[in-house]
Amino acid sequence: DVFRMNGHDRHRIRLRLGMLAHNLLVEEYPLAERDLAPDGESHWLLETEVAGFAGVARFVAGLLDDVEIVDSPELKRYVADYFRRNAAVIAD
């Protein structure tokens, strides 16, 4: 997938990205550019399929204030579970 993950399962995701998230996505994952569409003056929508949530979740977690998960409840649960599992690490 565009986040360089592989596997047989496919999950459709949709993210709304601010300018920072958009620029970092295109720089770090150039294949994502084909799945991006403008959404107003300073936002973009990424609609793509991923092989697993680990790669995209890492991207979302690092830019949480500039990425909105849209119509992707499985990804929302994955990210929320990731933060719950690791809460002790960031609480110390």
Tell me what each language-model feature is.
Residues 1-92:
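Polybasic (Lys/Arg-rich)
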